[in-house]
Amino acid sequence: MLRDLFVKKKKYAAIPSEQVRKDVPDGVMTKCPECKKIMYTKELLKNLKVCVNCGYHHPMNAWERLDSILDEGSFREYDKEMVSLNPLEFPGYEEKLESDRKKTELNEAVVTGEGTIDDMLVVVAVMDSRFRMGSMGSVVGEKIARAVEKAYDLQVPFIIFTASGGARMQEGILSLMQMAKTSVALKKHSNAGGLFISVMTHPTTGGVSASFASLGDYNLAEPGALIGFAGRRVIEQTVREKLPEDFQTAEFLLDHGQLDAVVHRDDMRESLRKILEVHQGGEMAVWQS
């Protein structure tokens, strides 16, 4: 028809979205969930996985975290071979554990060991939210308790980086008792004059936030980290009030006295170094008395 002659034709051919995706290999680019900026993954990794545009702190795995804070080549891992069983015979639990082991190349949701920060020996534990959302089961609690006891034996500070959804439901009461076990180990370490630094990263919730994560001599957190016990919706339904938009963020907790500092990832190693340096003389005096 004549009117078809006057229809404005597209100047460019439409390229199917699938074809566009195929042009960029997986893993080359990363999209920031906060500002939506797309950047080279290599650039993000170089910046300690902090968005170069908005400063959003992307999750780090355990090994990336250890590399960012410890002296190169100084880390020695503890209890690497410990693995979770299925004591309550929870359906499908063993398959999920095996799937996470293959996906993360970890045996559990926490890596523990010793290393140095500016040549100062520390015992460190780093939780990895890729493994069962960093949930705390029997092995996670046992590894953390053993790490604290090792710090006690070596008379050195203990540092933990938390990232967890809370207690592991598939292990029931056995997971909940880890809250008490880890807290008792930390109390023994504290009574002997040992330093404990807790660094809460996104997210730190449930039984982890209600136990060892909040017991530090210094409680630090990364910017924007979600930290809390119960979920926002549960709390609002309980108190029947609308909560502030920034409720349960690291900044909110700092303003209300639950944290000592919110530390940017770029500054974390130096902040830890300064704390360790300040306590070096005093702590050794306590141990030796």
UniProtKB/Swiss-Prot annotation:
Its EC number is 2.1.3.15. Its cofactor is Zn(2+). Its main location: cytoplasm. Pathway: Lipid metabolism; malonyl-CoA biosynthesis; malonyl-CoA from acetyl-CoA: step 1/1. GO terms for cellular component: acetyl-CoA carboxylase complex. It catalyses: N(6)-carboxybiotinyl-L-lysyl-[protein] + acetyl-CoA = N(6)-biotinyl-L-lysyl-[protein] + malonyl-CoA. Gene3D superfamilies: 2-enoyl-CoA Hydratase, Chain A, domain 1. GO terms for biological process: malonyl-CoA biosynthetic process; mycolic acid biosynthetic process. InterPro entries: AcCoA_carboxyl_beta (IPR034733), Acetyl_CoA_COase_Trfase_b_su (IPR000438), ClpP/crotonase-like_dom_sf (IPR029045), COA_CT_N (IPR011762), Znf-ACC (IPR041010). SUPFAM superfamilies: ClpP/crotonase. It is an enzyme of class 2 (transferase). Binds 1 zinc ion per subunit. Residues 28-289 form the CoA carboxyltransferase N-terminal domain. Pfam families: Carboxyl_trans (PF01039), Zn_ribbon_ACC (PF17848). GO terms for molecular function: acetyl-CoA carboxylase activity; ATP binding; carboxyl- or carbamoyltransferase activity; zinc ion binding. It is found in: Cytoplasm. It comes from the Bacteria. A zinc finger (C4-type) spans 32-54. Zn(2+) binds at residues 32, 35, 51, 54. Keywords: ATP-binding, Cytoplasm, Fatty acid biosynthesis, Fatty acid metabolism, Lipid biosynthesis, Lipid metabolism, Metal-binding, Nucleotide-binding, Transferase, Zinc, Zinc-finger. NCBIfam families: accD. Component of the acetyl coenzyme A carboxylase (ACC) complex. Biotin carboxylase (BC) catalyzes the carboxylation of biotin on its carrier protein (BCCP) and then the CO(2) group is transferred by the transcarboxylase to acetyl-CoA to form malonyl-CoA. Acetyl-CoA carboxylase is a heterohexamer composed of biotin carboxyl carrier protein (AccB), biotin carboxylase (AccC) and two subunits each of ACCase subunit alpha (AccA) and ACCase subunit beta (AccD). Belongs to the AccD/PCCB family. This is Acetyl-coenzyme A carboxylase carboxyl transferase subunit beta.
